[in-house]
């Protein structure tokens, strides 16, 4: 193994160890049980193989700094639609639940509502966290379901809570960049005929220190959208 291979291997294992926690281990076991060892190994390789083009430096170069975020908070749009963010939640680890909610509270665009359908009625700790935030900010709405309805049922329950002009879906362990809703509303102000806005996405480590595996989506292409690609 040459020095380059050693370095790459070190990065792979270092990244893997950095992402290991009870939640990711549990998800890994579920994936292994559902898809089998072959698909699990392919997935593991995809997640931890080194990036051909480093994403971290690009990300750091393009994220808005504190001054830009403050400028966005003061900006007045002519059109200020309410955006509902629907979240189906089920046995969400507290660290991810708090990070997800905080990412909404950190938005530079203020006219949003967070609609959480809680499918874990037996999880008193999770209910306490949700009550803590919903009592603090009226934009955070929680519906405690009588039982877990599954991902589809919980999602539909969250969607029924939405009262905004636009609705977005967010997984219970996902985050929004602080300027995410601002950029969406900026685009809606540029073209009032828009019905749908889609965005790029990436993954982030549990401690939020490293962004990786970006999914940078192309401009809208009707032929591509309707193809099997």
Residue ranges with predicted function:
Residues 179-211:
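Conserved donor NDP-sugar-binding/catalytic core segment of glycosyltransferases
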Residues 171-175, 200:
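The conserved acidic donor/metal-binding loop of glycosyltransferases
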Residues 145-162:
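Glycine-rich, basic loop-to-helix element that forms the pyrophosphate-binding segment
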Residues 37-102:
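N-proximal low-complexity "stem/linker" segments adjacent to membrane-targeting elements
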Residues 167:
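Short aromatic/hydrophobic "clamp" motif used to bind/position activated sugar donors
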């Amino acid at each position: 193994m040459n020095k380059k291979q050693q370095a790459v291997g070190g990065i792979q294992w270092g990244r893997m160890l950095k992402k290991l926690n009870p939640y990711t281990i549990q998800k890994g076991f579920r994936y292994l049980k559902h898809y089998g060892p072959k698909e699990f190994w392919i997935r593991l390789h995809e997640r931890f193989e080194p990036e051909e083009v480093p994403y971290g430096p690009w990300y750091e170069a393009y994220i808005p700094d504190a001054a830009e975020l403050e400028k966005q908070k003061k900006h007045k749009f002519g059109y200020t639609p309410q955006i509902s963010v629907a979240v189906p939640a089920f046995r969400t680890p507290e660290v991810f639940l708090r990070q997800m909610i905080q990412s909404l509270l950190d938005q530079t665009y203020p006219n949003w509502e967070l609609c959480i359908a809680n499918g874990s009625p037996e999880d008193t700790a999770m209910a306490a966290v949700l009550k803590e935030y919903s009592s603090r900010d009226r934009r955070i709405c929680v519906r405690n379901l009588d039982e877990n309805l599954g991902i589809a049922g919980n999602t539909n329950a969250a969607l029924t809570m939405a009262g905004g002009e636009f609705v977005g879906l967010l997984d219970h362990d996902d985050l929004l960049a602080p300027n995410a809703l601002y950029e969406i509303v900026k685009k809606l102000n540029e073209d009032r005929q828009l019905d749908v806005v889609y965005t790029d996405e990436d993954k982030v480590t549990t401690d939020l220190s490293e962004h990786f595996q970006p999914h940078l989506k192309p401009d809208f292409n009707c032929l591509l959208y309707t193809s099997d690609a």
